[in-house]
UniProtKB/Swiss-Prot annotation:
UniProt key word Transmembrane: yes
Organism this protein belongs to: Sus scrofa
Sequence similarity: Belongs to the peptidase A22A family.
UniProt lineage: Eukaryota, Metazoa, Chordata, Craniata, Vertebrata
Domain of life of the source: Eukaryota
Name under which the protein is recorded: Presenilin-2
Chief place of localization: endoplasmic reticulum
InterPro entries membership: Pept_A22A_PS2, Peptidase_A22A, Preselin/SPP, Presenilin_C
Segments in the Lumenal topological domain: 109-138, 188-200, 245-249, 383-388
Length: 448
């Protein structure tokens, strides 16, 4: 699932990201200062309104573009192109890093390519000589796996709809604990064993403890944005490696195709669970839990100013009970708030508004299944680099097209269908057509 979000300026001093950020109430002002500020604000507003009316009379369509006052024609398109290219880079880097970690592990650590077990969600084995029976077992495994995903997604949406936040946080914290401590311990142990690096258990436990503790703080509380993004990429790679190891070969490919179809239905259907989750979060003006979403920019959730198109560009601030208490001075008289005016063309506020960027949010499930596809291409079949690179390029092309559609439709879109479809097409075509062709050329010592 891929969505846009409002973000802070690139020049913002704060470099931390958190799901809960406190908003400070403005300092109470005296009655005289408030009245004086109100009079000054009214005079400035009248002067600006008269000036804008004169400009509007000269050219009515001068500063009207897509319903945004104070923005000349063509600027919206330029911003879309600018942010579109930036968003592509913002998502290409983490997706590429996640897939590189998975492929590098698959190519070097034999533990994740050895088949010595299956997940409980895929109980049917594929070790049968009959092709039909193997295909049937893979379809049955896919049905069970997709059913589990659907049930758990609906359960999560119901919990969020009825505001069971503590239960959801406990669920996510438990999952993060397993990934950051148990799976990291297994991963680090296998890597050290592969490269024949000796390490005593106290040092190993201390390393895993430090890694997991910092990750829990960054993901579920607050910390540097780059560090949180790195932890989200790492836990996605660890989860993808588990799927690559324990999913049967044919079942993995059928599951990838089925999960892309489910993602399409869950996000675009009016009653789809993921769409209901996003709409509920937007109605409540709340962020989706950071343990489920990778965000490319800072998220401000409390005290964040919101531009409401229905108010004709006026700056809307969320209601804060503390502000209501602070609006009265020590004598019990109300103090007059400052007057907020939208930035007009030619004023410094417009530059600040243009510098604001919108971030992109991509679900961690998309990272996981992207990496599963590339990792399976590297681990199964021939496992040559041509097939792996073809799947890698296909996923990036699909992600780029998805971002293009996101810029056009400006709503939450599924990120799996296009990328997974391209990846499957590139995998089977490269593995069955390109690889035999190149092997034949190499055997005859012909080079193109």
């Amino acid at each position: 699932m891929l969505t846009f979000m409002a973000s802070d300026s690139e020049e913002e001093v704060c470099d931390e990201r958190t799901s809960l950020m406190s908003a400070e109430s403005p300092t109470p002002r005296s009655c005289q200062e408030g009245r004086q500020g109100l009079e000054d604000g009214e005079s400035a507003a009248q002067w600006r309104s008269q000036d804008s009316e004169e400009d509007h009379e000269e050219d009515p369509d001068r500063y009207v573009c897509s319903g945004v006052p104070g923005r000349p024609p063509g600027l919206e398109e330029e911003l879309t192109l600018k942010y579109g290219a930036k968003h592509v880079i913002m998502l290409f880097v983490p997706v590429t890093l996640c897939m590189i970690v998975v492929v590098a592990t698959i190519k070097s650590v034999r533990f994740y390519t050895e088949k010595n077990g299956q997940l409980i969600y895929t109980p049917f084995t594929e070790d049968t000589p009959s092709v039909g029976q193997r295909l049937l077992n893979s379809v049955l495994n896919t049905l069970i796996m997709i059913s589990v995903i659907v049930v758990m997604t609906i359960f999560l949406v119901v919990l969020y709809k009825y505001r069971c936040y503590k239960f959801i946080h406990g669920w996510l914290i438990t999952s993060s604990l397993m990934l950051l401590f148990l799976f990291t311990y297994i991963y680090l142990g296998e890597v050290l064993k592969t490269y024949n690096v000796a390490m005593d258990y106290p040092t190993l436990f201390l390393t895993v403890w430090n890694f997991g503790a910092v990750g829990m703080v960054c993901i579920h509380w607050k910390g540097p944005l780059v560090l949180q993004q790195a932890y989200l990429i790492m836990i996605s790679a660890l989860m993808a490696l588990v799927f690559i190891k324990y999913l049967p070969e044919w079942s993995a490919w059928v599951i990838l195709g089925a999960i892309s179809v489910y993602d399409l239905v869950a996000v675009l259907c009016p009653k789809g669970p993921l769409r209901m989750l996003v709409e509920t979060a937007q109605e409540r003006n709340e962020p989706i839990f950071p343990a489920l979403i990778y965000s490319s920019a800072m998220v401000w959730t409390v005290g964040m100013a919101k531009l409401d198109p229905s108010s004709q560009g006026a700056l809307q601030l969320p209601y804060d009970p503390e502000m209501e208490e602070d609006s009265y001075d020590s004598f019990g008289e109300p103090s007059y708030p400052e007057v907020f005016e939208p930035p007009l063309p030619g004023y410094p506020g417009e530059e600040l508004e243009e510098e604001e960027e919108r971030g992109v949010k991509l679900g961690l499930g998309d990272f996981i299944f992207y990496s599963v596809l590339v990792g399976k291409a590297a681990a199964t079949g021939s496992g040559d680099w041509n097939t792996t690179l073809a799947c890698f390029v296909a996923i990036l092309i699909g992600l780029c097209l998805t971002l293009l559609l996101l810029a056009v439709f400006k709503k939450a879109l599924p990120a799996l269908p296009i990328s997974i479809t391209f990846g499957l097409i590139f995998y089977f075509s490269t593995d069955n057509l390109v690889r035999p062709f190149m092997d034949t050329l190499a055997s005859h010592q012909l080079y193109i």
